[in-house]
From Swiss-Prot:
Assembly mode: Homodimer.
Localisation: Cytoplasm
Lineage of the species this protein comes from: Bacteria, Bacillati, Mycoplasmatota, Mollicutes, Mycoplasmataceae
Protein name (database record): tRNA (guanine-N(1)-)-methyltransferase
Residues binding S-adenosyl-L-methionine, per UniProt: 111, 130-135
EC number: 2.1.1.228
Catalytic activity line of the entry: guanosine(37) in tRNA + S-adenosyl-L-methionine = N(1)-methylguanosine(37) in tRNA + S-adenosyl-L-homocysteine + H(+)
InterPro entries: Alpha/beta_knot_MTases, tRNA_m1G_MeTrfase_C_sf, tRNA_m1G_MeTrfase_TrmD, tRNA_m1G_MTases_N, tRNA_MeTrfase_TRMD/TRM10
Keyword Repeat (UniProt): no
Family designation: Belongs to the RNA methyltransferase TrmD family.
Example of a GO cellular component annotation carried by this entry: cytosol
Chief location bin: cytoplasm
Pfam families in the record: tRNA_m1G_MT (PF01746)
Length: 240
């Protein structure tokens, strides 16, 4: 998988990809990340890529010409072009899986300032938001896209790891514990120390349903629950 990130702030992207799982994925050649400085496509003095908006108003707007030049410099027939914007569809695990499973090259355009010339949307395949709040620029959103998609690709993390993560099968992850066994009168559940793998698996499945019902009931899809989880779900719903 190749990611091409079009940004005004390459250092933000570079500092993140030099750490942790993303760095290891790059070293293993599971992913490739190309950082594209939007200012390199400006034809104006001081590499200007923004200007005042027609009709008046506060805030600068990203100009269409450097944006399109940057996109076209890396786009191929196998590319999908994403724009990070609060006007886009909200990113979730289902969308992440779609990108991970269906594309070889993802171009991410980082939004900035007051916005972008509306005409750029003719060159965008998907607009993506990471939530209903405002951040300074699209760099953080682009890194969230890269990180979440990369985790699902072969040879990035162990298959077992992402199968057990939150949002797989529309459930939150089960509680996890480590040493010490007891802290301020709070003990690790005994089942986890029993060595009985079937009981541990059963407990974890129960806890996934319980936690999701309490914290994110909107996530649950009963068609994705196994028989044991469905029993817990029905019991919990009956108690409410």
């Amino acid at each position: 998988m190749k990611f091409s990130i079009i940004t005004l702030f390459p250092k933000i992207i570079n500092s993140y990809i030099e750490e942790s799982i993303i760095k290891r994925a790059i070293n293993k050649q599971a992913i490739k990340i190309e950082i594209i400085d939007l200012r390199n496509f400006s034809t104006l003095s001081h590499n200007q890529v923004d200007d005042y908006q027609y009709g008046g108003g506060s805030g600068m707007v990203l100009m269409i010409e450097p944006l399109i030049k940057a996109i076209e410099s890396v786009k191929t027939t196998k590319s999908i072009v994403l724009l990070t914007t609060p006007q886009g569809k909200t990113l979730n695990q289902s969308i992440v899986k779609t990108y991970a499973n269906n594309y070889e090259h993802i171009i991410i355009v980082c939004g900035h300032y007051e916005g972008y010339d509306e005409r750029v949307l003719d060159y965008i395949d998907d607009e993506i938001s990471i939530g209903d709040y405002v951040i300074t620029g699209g760099e953080l959103a682009s890194l969230i896209l890269v990180d979440s998609i990369s985790r699902l690709l072969p040879n990035v993390i162990k298959q077992e790891s992402h199968e057990n993560e939150s949002f797989e099968n529309n459930l939150l992850d089960h509680p996890v514990y480590t040493k010490p066994y007891e802290f301020r009168n709070k003990k690790v559940p005994d089942v986890l120390l029993s060595g009985h793998h079937q009981n541990i698996k059963k407990w974890r499945e129960e806890q996934q349903v319980i936690k999701t019902l309490k914290k994110r009931p909107d996530l649950i899809d009963i068609t994705k629950l196994n028989r044991h989880q469905l029993e817990i779900y029905k019991k919990m719903k009956g108690e409410q």
